[in-house]
Amino acid sequence: MNLSELLIELLLMPLVAFVIGLGMVLMMRKIAARLGRRIGPPLLQPIYDIIKLYGKRTQISHGLIHEIGIIMAVGGYVAAETLLPVPGMNGLADKGGVITLAYVMMIPSLGMALGVGQCANPNGSIGISRALTAMLAYDIPFILVIFGAAYVYGTTNLADIIAIQQQQGVSGWGLMQMPLLALAGMLALPAVMGKQPFEIYIAPAEIATGPMVEMSGKFMGGLFVMQCFQLYTAGVLYTTLFLGGGAYWITFLPKIYAVVAIPMAAAMLFPRYRTEDVIRLMWKWPVLVGLMGLAVAMK
Amino acid sequence: MSKDLNIWLDDLLGDIENIQFKRKSSRRVRVDVGSEALPALLELLQGRASYVHLSAISCVDWIEDEEFELVYHVWSYETRSLVSAHTRIPREPGVYLSIYDLYQPAAFFERDIHEMFGVFFEGSPDMEKFILTEWDGPPPMRKEFDSEAFVNQHFEWEQYHPQWLKDLEEEGGGVTTRPEDIRL
Amino acid sequence: MSKLDNIPVRHQPTEAAGRKRTNPLAHVFDELVKFCQSRSMFMLHYCTGCGAIELPPAMTSRFDMERLGIQPMVTPRQADILLITGYVSIKTLKRIILTYEQMQSPKYVIGICSCTVNGGMYWQSYATAKVLKDYLPVDVYIAGCMPRPEAVISGMRELMSDIKSGRAQNWKRYYENYDHYLGNQQKLFGEDWQTPTDIIAEARHYGLMTDRTLGEHTALLEKHQRPLEALEMRLSAREKQKT
Amino acid sequence: MRPENYQARSQPPSNEFELNFGPNHPGIEGNYAFRVKLNGDQVLEARADAGYLHRGFEKLMEGRLWIQNIALVPRICVPDPVPMEVCYSLAIEEIGGLEVPERAKWIRVMQLEMSRLAAHLFAFGGHAATTGMYTTMFWGVADRDLILDRFEELTGGRVYSIYNIPGGVRRDVPEGFLDRLSSLLDYLESRLPDYDNLFFTNQVFVKRARGVGAMTQEQALKWGVTGPNLRATGLEFDVRRDDPYLVYDQLDFEIPTESGGDALARNLVRRAELKQSIRILRQVIERLPSIEGPIRCPIPNPLAWNVPAGEAYTRVESSKGELAYYVVSTGGDKPYRVHVRGPSSMHAVQVLEKLALGARLEDIAQIMFSLDACPPEVDR
């Protein structure tokens, strides 16, 4: 692969991720609306929101760290997108691998913590401390699932993982090979995406939307963009590990949307857990299922 | 039941002096009592007659008599009747005893009356401003406070005088409604 | 109370002063932003009065405001629309002004219910402010006691079309006529009324300073200037009085 | 205020901090505020701050005619306005010695129960939203809207009906109204299992709400708790049955109780009351056509009506608890004094302050919404 092709891919991959992520945000809001017997927002609503937020006249910044925090939050995901292979584009997937990805996916939360800390709003601080605790909760099953999958496939290279699965057709998918690990991943997925019942860190009725409380204008817009990436990353990673990745966009897109839609639909049927219940739940069931899956995989 | 209640209350209240007792209906009893005897009456009602629920304390400003009337409505879950104990205190200086030790809900009502009428209750746990924290005029519920005059003095209204109103006024003003059109 | 008679009610859109738009695409961008602003309105989740009871029906399944891109937001920082749902008591009005000044421009105020127009049925009440537009620039009034959800949504659509065509510029009036609004506020809250937001500096920043921004009332700001204090919190009053 | 004056306050290092909870906060019902002192997540002290909705109702009513006040009273409690009108009318009827026709009494009961249904749907929808379950809120508010449609048909007003006047009600029941009401009740009853599955038996919700804001029966009696909140502590008491007004003594209904005294129990009591209200409404639908007669007794010209001197204390059971009016007349055309005892004046102030102590930050909103506190009743 020559340098110019790589550069184009690096540019294109986050862009594609953003567009698909917008669709996921729309889908999330539509699902919430349909379950609530509503019609829901129009087709382009997510992009309207983002353009509007960037077009605000007043942009209140709380200082350099505040801005850097948002850049880290978005940038962390942009970096993650280049590590995630999609049909036709591998980006840095060959070089990085799933371990780098797992590290990179923690950067946004830390960036948010930095930015929110600068705002000095107690609601934000409480929210971000809850968010980091929730990250601690879901990271154990998340890492467990990733390592289990890497062990089974014998590689941490995501492009190779896709190739291995596709050689054997549907029966070669991770879902068939290691159903327990796939189940553990599915259980942890709502927490990775930050949806009910694991979203107490943004509970509006308690801490006025927590970390977002002082975010406005382009900072809020940045968080909206981050949400697109967040949903996309979770969907694509799960698809890559367990659903055979994508050879063609036409099979890849339904898979990632379905992966995101399942936790979304469940989320609207549950209230929030308390923080300690999140940890208890996350360290109990997904970890237990994941460990069993690991044991089965190792024999 | 109501007759028993009457006799029973008569017995109970017999040993308090300066008390008038009137049964309004089977579940409503009015008691007029001197201000010095009211706490004792309430203590009796609560301790010996199971009137444990203080429904409300109402204050009425009888400006012509220079008096505040305090009405304590207490309810018994057992006899299912409500006793309204009326007492009067002089308007000046407007100080009375708190019954917080007997009935905890009194704290809210006493705070409210203090705020709205300026009656101070000795022994009440909290006499701070609550609703009118940003009001520095006289206690507004006193009869001498004229809300309308205050508003006219402090606020201005939108000058609303459209053409159709002017036309109406030229014609002699007022909207005429035929008697058969008046509906309640 | 100073009068607003000599000031036009709606401004023609003025070019941002001090900045020349040379980019030929700037106009296109402006139009795009305006369109998106009209299609994505975040309203502040603040029930100031009884009209708020008709907002849940307007937001939920029956009338579904999200169809129009309107959704509630929690903090003033993120909101575009301040809905004044009904009468404003003086205590609430202070909070409303604080909230309004913290919102990010462009921002819009919608006065719902008759009480925001002229005091409504509480005209003789000592505790409510009567004419909302004396204290804040109001973009749209929705009259009624209380307006039905359809009326609320229709008022929102009115505001949407105003934003799209660029007529809804009332937020600029707050900067341009700050002295007038501050004067009315001071009349109600006392001379030493101050808010933590520096409106004058913001007006200078946006190039919205006029000769009506500064005046006798803003001079009082300097006079009564005092350091920012935390809101007084007397939690232990109860224990203190007891002892 | 100039930016150069923004100064960070120096505070001694401490785990404790203060937080303003409201008035502009989605965890607050209406326009109300709390100041809480927290240690980490735990509330050390809480103090209610009311008055944001103060309009001086009691003062305003002294300046208006008896009949004009009918338009004023429903505004005191916005989600559940009908008991206000009825209670005020009952007081005037008691002072003036008016004999309300039988038919009017039944129509009033019908209205009261419709209002209770609407208020309860709103209340637990709101509670669900504080715990992050917006679907229940969407459903609850939408179903409440169907009841408002029936109100509109009956009275002409969606929220504030201004339909009860001293001496009876303003209009007779429209033709076919009872059939439509009946089919609405069928619909609501068919929805109840859905609500059960979605919300009341949802394990996440049960886990969240159990033990939150719990009080014992002794505490509840001591603090002046009334209504569903009192019944959630196990005391079977209802003003409708134990201090009957209108025709509640002729109706057959149960008083649901729970023993927990916590947020969950309070919601379950409301859930059970929905069923009882539907049951009462069905009885009304059955009996109303057979009760002939006028819908109001003749009253003098209301614009020049001098209600005879006297005083009355009337109580009704609103959806929040015991609602009472103390009305004094000196024989004039205006009331001399009206005192409103809103149920939330206890629940939203003292009870909430006490229950919040030791609770956690995430539970304050739940406690407030489970008590169904209505701030305008406090502020008046």
Q: Where do the protein language model's features map onto the residues?
A:
Chain D
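Active-site bordering "gate/hinge" segments
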Residues: 1-380
